[in-house]
UniProtKB/Swiss-Prot annotation:
Its main location: cytoplasm. Phosphorylated by MAP kinases. GO terms for molecular function: actin monomer binding. This is Profilin-2. Disulfide bonds join C13-C118. Belongs to the profilin family.
Length: 134
């Protein structure tokens, strides 16, 4: 399966049981910051933003004082799973980033999608990729 199909079919799809509710943007990005696939709405990010995210996976808590920045948007870092998932909140929306062996699975949401729904969509694909050795 092509990487774009993972984004289109598994991240930007309707949320289970909530027809018409979906993430506002999603991407799969390599650990080096190269974009493997993304939705048309995924923000253009700076290399230093991706470096900060990768540092937080290696040194959990790194982003907590400054926030998570992606595409010029600042998210307040909320509970995650050290070395596995980073979650951020901004107003009525937020972001979930799941690290796999080779990539970051990113999902951005706004209401009516809930944080839990975004987590489920992003982490389910991330877990699948981990199971595949990716």
């Amino acid at each position: 399966m092509l990487w774009q199909a993972y984004v289109d079919d598994h991240l930007m799809c309707d949320i289970e049981g909530h027809e018409g509710h979906r993430l506002t943007a999603a991407a799969i990005v390599g650990h080096d910051g190269s974009v493997w696939a993304q939705s048309a709405t995924f923000p253009q990010f700076k290399p230093e933003e991706m470096n900060g995210i990768m540092t937080d996976f290696n040194e959990p808590g790194h982003l907590a004082p400054t926030g998570l920045h992606l595409g010029g948007t600042k998210y307040m870092v909320i509970q995650g799973e050290a070395g596995a998932v980073i979650r951020g909140k901004k107003g009525s929306g937020g972001i979930t980033i799941k690290e796999t062996g080779q990539a970051l699975v990113c999902g951005i949401y706004k209401e009516p999608v809930t944080p839990g729904q975004c987590n489920m969509v992003v982490e389910r694909l991330g877990d699948y990729l981990l199971e595949q050795g990716l």
